[in-house]
Regions:
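Active-site beta->alpha loop and helix N-cap motifs at the rims of alpha/beta catalytic domains
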Residues: 1-58
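Catalytic alpha/beta core domains of metabolic enzymes, predominantly
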Residues: 39-40, 44, 52-138
Length: 138
């Protein structure tokens, strides 16, 4: 919460968070965690960071639907390996909010992610090889 408040104070555009790690928590606890972070920075947009292979918890459609009730949730960074997740989050987000952003995470899936609806990508090598990814984006 302290980092969320600080982030808002310094003027970030959005805050992203993975679910709590180590202990596997029920979905209502993950929603409460994300909503508490979002509430700590009430004037800042929130991005759900779905990276189940490292966080140990996948963003399910039921948890996603619960998070769509939070008006500050504007996007998902999807780093799960099934690219179909991008389509599901995009469609459900658009249905719930009218506008919704989905970022592709895995660098190796950038082209596939963009082809099936990701609005952009946030990845480890994008900043190291920006020309390549800009060209791929064309």
């Amino acid at each position: 919460m302290e980092l969320a408040r600080h982030s808002e104070e310094v003027g970030v555009d959005a805050i992203a968070s993975i679910p709590p790690i180590y202990f596997r928590l029920p979905e209502y606890s993950i929603a409460a965690y994300w909503n508490a972070i979002s509430a700590a920075a009430p004037n800042t947009d929130f991005v759900i960071y779905n990276i189940p292979q490292l966080a140990g918890t996948a963003l399910t459609m039921s948890l996603f639907a619960e998070m769509m009730k939070n008006p500050k949730v504007v996007a998902v960074k999807n780093s799960s390996m099934p690219t179909q997740d991008i389509q599901m989050f995009k469609a459900a987000g658009m249905a719930a909010k009218g506008e919704f952003i989905v970022f592709n995470g895995p660098d190796e899936q950038f082209v596939a992610g963009r082809a099936i609806g990701a609005d952009g990508g946030i990845g480890g090598t994008y900043g190291v090889m920006p020309e390549l990814f800009l060209k791929l984006n064309e």
